[in-house]
Amino acid sequence: MNRKDEHLSLAKAFHKEKSNDFDRVRFVHQSFAESAVNEVDISTSFLSFQLPQPFYVNAMTGGSQRAKEINQQLGIIAKETGLLVATGSVSAALKDASLADTYQIMRKENPDGLIFANIGAGLGVEEAKRALDLFQANALQIHVNVPQELVMPEGDRDFTNWLTKIEAIVQAVEVPVIVKEVGFGMSQETLEKLTSIGVQAADVSGQGGTSFTQIENARRKKRELSFLDDWGQSTVISLLESQNWQKKLTILGSGGVRNSLDIVKGLALGAKSMGVAGTILASLMSKNGLENTLALVQQWQEEVKMLYTLLGKKTTEELTSTALVLDPVLVNWCHNRGIDSTVFAKR
């Protein structure tokens, strides 16, 4: 079994809905919504993209025949629903051209859709351009994943030039570049560094869903690094960390998104759109995966409309004026990190 298929099997094995920091955020219910479902517009826009719903499928897989089947199904679902989809890391196809079709199948199924290509931060300008050319990607995701690399038996050990390489790519390619974590979250300091090198967008991708340290540790013979299973900031904390950067960077959120309520909470905390991966992957890998996942996406579209209505909001942009209350764990984090946690409850 190659590493890509190992990741798929382990992600499925470890996937379970569990409590996370989205449960520490509560909306303030208002009895008079003064809204109607048929008046709600759940579309969103960021960078140069207009999207019919405020969530997307985040980077998952590619580089094997099993992964090709999943990407084909994602392409079909995206065409049917208008979903933006990001591929898994295309590094495998850059090393072995015979694997290119495991990613290109998504474009074949969805020729006019929005698809992001994904590469690691250790790659350079030429690899970035080749990744975009694989299937005429609309944007480039560059993932940063130091904890995963360190736990991965064959992972990278030198991260000294990542920022320099990202900056060079930002200057060289003609499409937007989104820097994405892989489930470990982002801090204020990280966002400041990304802004300083000209990055336009960041997907803070926090802890709370799929743990790639857990997955990579399961691939180690002794499995001795389990203490890193929950390393990092949650998606909610990462969005709180991003508050002072949301006017300078396009902020996207992902990591541990289980349902439509999590999506709307992330939007209320300032994300322009929310990415989903683990929940979608688990659905696709179940019996009747394609049909079930298409139904799930359509269900979420309707539920998001209901939630906007419940909150008395007619557009995605209005959600950032919705009152919400953070529990003491989140308030304590904000206090220690110099973030004003009181503003959310008074909006």
Curated annotation (Swiss-Prot):
- Species assigned in the record: Enterococcus faecalis (strain ATCC 700802 / V583)
EC class name = isomerase
Record: residues binding Mg(2+):
149
Q: Which Pfam families match?
A: FMN_dh
Cellular location(s): Cytoplasm
Give the UniProt family note.
Belongs to the IPP isomerase type 2 family.
Residues binding substrate: 3-4, 148
Q: What is its EC number?
A: 5.3.3.2
Q: According to its UniProt entry, what is the function of this protein?
A: Involved in the biosynthesis of isoprenoids. Catalyzes the 1,3-allylic rearrangement of the homoallylic substrate isopentenyl (IPP) to its allylic isomer, dimethylallyl diphosphate (DMAPP).
Q: Could you say which cofactors this protein requires?
A: FMN; NADPH; Mg(2+)
Q: Where on this chain does FMN bind?
A: 59-61, 89, 118, 180, 205, 210, 256-258, 277-278
At the top level, the lineage of the source is: Bacteria
Q: Which SUPFAM superfamilies does the record associate with it?
A: FMN-linked oxidoreductases
Gene Ontology CC terms, in alphabetical order:
cytoplasm
- Record's subunit section: Homooctamer. Dimer of tetramers.
Q: Which reaction does it catalyse?
A: isopentenyl diphosphate = dimethylallyl diphosphate
Q: Which GO terms describe its molecular function?
A: FMN binding; isopentenyl-diphosphate delta-isomerase activity; magnesium ion binding; NADPH binding; oxidoreductase activity
Q: What is its main location?
A: cytoplasm
NCBIfam families registered for this protein in UniProt: IPP_isom_2
Q: Which UniProt keywords apply?
A: Cytoplasm, Flavoprotein, FMN, Isomerase, Isoprene biosynthesis, Magnesium, Metal-binding, NADP
GO BP terms, alphabetized: isoprenoid biosynthetic process
Protein name, entry field: Isopentenyl-diphosphate delta-isomerase
